[in-house]
Amino acid sequence: MEGSNQFLGTERIGKLMQKYAIPCIISLLVGALYNIVDQIFIANASYLGSYGNAANTVVFPLTVVALAIAVMIGDGCCAFVSISLGQDEVRKAKRSVGNAVVVCLVSSIVLTAIYLIFADIILAMFGGTVNAETYRHSQEYFFYITLGVPFYMFGQAMNPIIRADGSPRFAMISTLAGAVLNVILDPVFIFGFRWGMMGAAVATVTGQVVTAILAVWYLLHMKIIKPAAGDFALRGKVCSRMLTLGITSFLSQISLVAAMAAINNMIRKYGALDAVFGQEQYAQIPMAVVGIVMKFFQIVISIVVGMAAGCIPIVGFNMGARKSARVKELFTRLLAAEAGVGAVALVLVEIFPRQLIALFGAANESVYYTDFAVRSFRIYLCMIILACVNKACFIFLQAMGKAGESTALSMVREVVFGVGFALLLPHFFGLDGVLYSMPLSDIPTFLMAAYLIVKTYRSLEESHT
């Protein structure tokens, strides 16, 4: 076997986590910043404000659909490659990379076509009709964001594959380059040219194009798993195994889309019944605020997922090499780190909610906006420690090849409990019921995750003895 990946089975676990997890965290944080930076600049543009923020909230789940497909391909290929290399099957690893590229390109083109053809229907499904001004901004933003979907998906899919090739730093740099360009262009297009939602979208897409170009360059210069021309021919067994390994990443994202769709529509419905938010000039506030809360949640989850996803090559290699003691040590360290991230986030939202809100243009908004935002932060994120631990379990189980358990946990959290509570609780508690839906869903999910954690620990101990 090519020796450059052998250190995954011998190097100290803590050092490996730093090498692989930190670049992955930065990459995911930077990826999350694409949409978050847009929302910050939009919110602080007085001619867009909460209407633009609400539009961003409407479109955001649709970018997550693209991300879901991309990470299914990328994370699945990453796990496939890592396990193959651990078993000294380099040829199989190269074949999976070629197949991943083709599947990503085809699926991105299909998704772009669907978005362009059914734009009005899709926006209405995600709450875009809260009022006329929000809908107008949503249409404009969505059109230009859709044009960048193929570039976005390719860049996101290649990121974990580049890490699996032993280049986590390049994966980080490629994502960082696009995000930095987005940050530079956003104020130019929004405040300088006054392009509004179009400007925010064009800045984002430009950054995505840069990331995709860097990913193409790396694909042509891979160190270990560079595919040959014949490896791009689709093979059913390779695609099936790869997508099976990545299905948890897909479902964890796509189920989040289902939850966001339910939340957006319940906000639109019960906001219209509220004494304040039922007025046309304030109707967009709940949608805008919940979008801000979700963006903060996304930042935290990006750190959590980055830690876990960065460990996929380490887990895959050591599972393939039958070094279960190292896998167990990694699992223990990962859970402790994830809980720590959740604790820090909880302190921030409970003590400094107004400072967090201020980033998103609160100075330009009414007192109704600020008060609802403070309440939303404290309610929606009150169980964020459990959410962090749950996410870690989903991805770790996936890395160990236990796609069934991981998929079940992910679906139960977002769809069964998340959507269920989002549809049920507002009947009794109005808008507050919508906010409580996600934290409440983390409690039963954690109990299920705890059972699987204990079961996994025992299986690792048995395989080691």
Give the location of each predicted region.
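Short alpha-helical transmembrane segments in multi-pass integral membrane proteins
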Residues: 1-21, 81-148, 192-247, 315-383, ...
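N-terminal transmembrane alpha-helices
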Residues: 9-48, 61-76, 80, 105-112, ...
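Transmembrane helical elements of multi-pass membrane transporters/channels
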Residues: 19-38, 144, 178, 207-211, ...
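Transmembrane alpha-helix boundary and packing residues in multipass membrane permease domains
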Residues: 24, 28, 40, 79, ...
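Short runs within selected transmembrane alpha-helices of multi-pass transporters and secretion channels
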Residues: 27, 74, 144-163, 171-179, ...
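Helix-terminus/linker motif at the lipid-water interface of multi-pass membrane proteins
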Residues: 29, 33-54, 123-132, 188-195, ...
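Small-residue hotspots at the loop-to-helix junctions and early N-terminal turns
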Residues: 50-61, 138, 142, 201, ...
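Small-residue-rich hydrophobic transmembrane alpha-helices
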Residues: 53-113, 152-171, 287-347, 351-353, ...
